[in-house]
Amino acid sequence: MATDVTETPAPLVDAAPEAPADAPAAPAADANAAKAKKATAPKKRASPTHLPYAEMVSEAITSLKERTGSSSYAIAKFVEDKHKAKLPPNFRKLLNVQLKKLVAGGKLTKVKNSYKLSSATKPNPKPKAAPKKPKTGAKKPKAAAKPKAKTPAKAKPATKPKPAAKPKAVVKPKTPAKPKAKPAAKAKPKTAGAKPKPLAKKAGRAKAAKTSAKDTPGKKAPAKKAAPSKKAATPVRKAPSRKAKK
């Protein structure tokens, strides 16, 4: 006889999820891509703080003022003394390279082992003289303006002649003429005082007056000239006195 066998089903077990095979390769690919970007990206150089080499070299040559030109050593020393803090450590190597470029570009001329500025790079002194002309033109109007200020000052003295009224003081000398007449008046009292003298003296005076009048006919003797007639009459006075003594 056949027996029935009952099969019991096996319990279901959850299968663990399989990890993707590409998972560990993904981060490695990202790292390689980042490195490639860094390699291709250009490095930014720090901008130099010093002046361009062309300017520094031309400044050194013009300041040194050497007839045969300045050597690379002299140029390097001058630039280092002036721009020492701003220069890179390999400055001398870069300077030699720049000197060769400047000679090739025609900005410098090499004579043996020295360098000179070419005629094209030398500064032209003519532009400096050009700005001087407007200065002189500006000064001329100033000189023209000065006489205008002086002319009113000159006109003021013309008004000053008003004190011409001062000549009134010149009229004062007329008053001294009056005292001249006073001495004549003083002389008259002397003649009045001579009246007590004898009549003989009066007759002598009259004769002397007549003789003086004859000597000067037609001329009227002024009052002042009467005084000398008295002096002429004095000898006549002495003559009668001598006769009286006899």
Swiss-Prot record:
Single GO molecular function: nucleosomal DNA binding
Region (Disordered): 1-51, 105-246
Domain H15 as annotated: residue spans: 49-119
InterPro entries (UniProt xref): H1/H5, Histone_H1/H5_H15, WH-like_DNA-bd_sf, WH_DNA-bd_sf
Residue intervals passing through the bilayer: none
Compartments it resides in: Nucleus; Chromosome
Gene3D superfamilies: Winged helix-like DNA-binding domain superfamily/Winged helix DNA-binding domain
PANTHER family: HISTONE H1
Main function: Histones H1 are necessary for the condensation of nucleosome chains into higher-order structures.
Protein name: Histone H1
Organism: Zea mays (Maize)
